[in-house]
Amino acid sequence: MKNILQSTECLEDQQNVSIRPNLLDEFIGQSSVVNNLKIFINAAYTRKEPMDHVLLYGPPGLGKTTLAHIIAKELKVNFRSTAGPLLSKAGDLAAILTNLQAKDILFIDEIHRLNRNIEEILYSAMEDFCLDIIVGEGCGARTLRVDLPKFTLVGATTRIGLLSNPLRDRFGIPIHLEFYSTEELIKVIQRAAKVIKTDISDSGAQEISLRARGTPRIALRLLRRIRDFIEVTEHNKTITDTFADKALLRLGIDKLGLDRQDIQYLKFIHDSNNPTGIDTISSGLSEDTGNIEETIEPYLIKINFIQRTPRGRVITQKAISYLKEQSYI
């Protein structure tokens, strides 16, 4: 029997648990988001009411799961976690909802992957805090309404466009997470280095931040890998910019944070000489379209290396110049 309340986090996020901030005051970056959340949380706590439903959306690795945990801790309520793909039947969701307590946080990761039948059950649960269950079959079928405790649903998605309008509109607090600045990532890296007891110079932290694609999860992953290198190969245990650069090059991460997958993607579009559709790119690279749209493209769009047009993806002159400069083409 599957566990629909099992951890929804990838192994990488589980490794980051010891580094994860527990309170909003410890959370680095996303300052406007943090400031607004403090208001919403304090208001709900003061009124002794459940917080309104929250939708966290943005590229992977920016702290959606971390913020969901923090909301529960700040409100001093229970945290329940599941994921859209785990909820395949109406009974799966009903089992979770009927076991919630008042003001609990229910976190649904990858909420865009809920099937429509499950979504429809959520409508009344979110709006009226009730669950309509059909009992019996055929002419003898009847609807049984079950009252639910007033809870807070926190949904997380990397693809908000895949959410239906009725579901999206039921979230009273939509929150968009942005890519991090270099300065913010440096703080993330320095804080993490202290937690994992690794010495790092300011220049070393900056070198990692410049290649972390504006994403804390990537910054922490690179920090751990560089720590592996320095513990095995160096007597001086301080991560400097020079050592970080050498280690990252060995990992196949260039000075902009691009890896082999990114370069293959850019070269494929460049060699096509025309706007290229996502399905064509997926077929040519043997990559899932979802992975391309969620993992590869957001950062390339941010740094103005590609553009999405109605006719397909187009590589920019800035990207072409970079590919030539680095001898990729």
UniProtKB/Swiss-Prot annotation:
It is found in: Cytoplasm. Mg(2+) binds at residue 65. Residues 181-252 are annotated as: Small ATPAse domain (RuvB-S). DNA binds at residues 308, 313. InterPro entries: AAA+_ATPase (IPR003593), AAA_lid_4 (IPR041445), DNA_helicase_Holl-junc_RuvB (IPR004605), P-loop_NTPase (IPR027417), RuvB-like_N (IPR008824), RuvB_C (IPR008823), WH-like_DNA-bd_sf (IPR036388), WH_DNA-bd_sf (IPR036390). Its main location: cytoplasm. GO terms for molecular function: ATP binding; ATP hydrolysis activity; four-way junction DNA binding; four-way junction helicase activity. Residues 255-329 are annotated as: Head domain (RuvB-H). It catalyses: ATP + H2O = ADP + phosphate + H(+). GO terms for cellular component: cytoplasm; Holliday junction resolvase complex. PANTHER family: HOLLIDAY JUNCTION BRANCH MIGRATION COMPLEX SUBUNIT RUVB, PTHR42848. Homohexamer. Forms an RuvA(8)-RuvB(12)-Holliday junction (HJ) complex. HJ DNA is sandwiched between 2 RuvA tetramers; dsDNA enters through RuvA and exits via RuvB. An RuvB hexamer assembles on each DNA strand where it exits the tetramer. Each RuvB hexamer is contacted by two RuvA subunits (via domain III) on 2 adjacent RuvB subunits; this complex drives branch migration. In the full resolvosome a probable DNA-RuvA(4)-RuvB(12)-RuvC(2) complex forms which resolves the HJ. Has 3 domains, the large (RuvB-L) and small ATPase (RuvB-S) domains and the C-terminal head (RuvB-H) domain. The head domain binds DNA, while the ATPase domains jointly bind ATP, ADP or are empty depending on the state of the subunit in the translocation cycle. During a single DNA translocation step the structure of each domain remains the same, but their relative positions change. Belongs to the RuvB family. This is Holliday junction branch migration complex subunit RuvB.
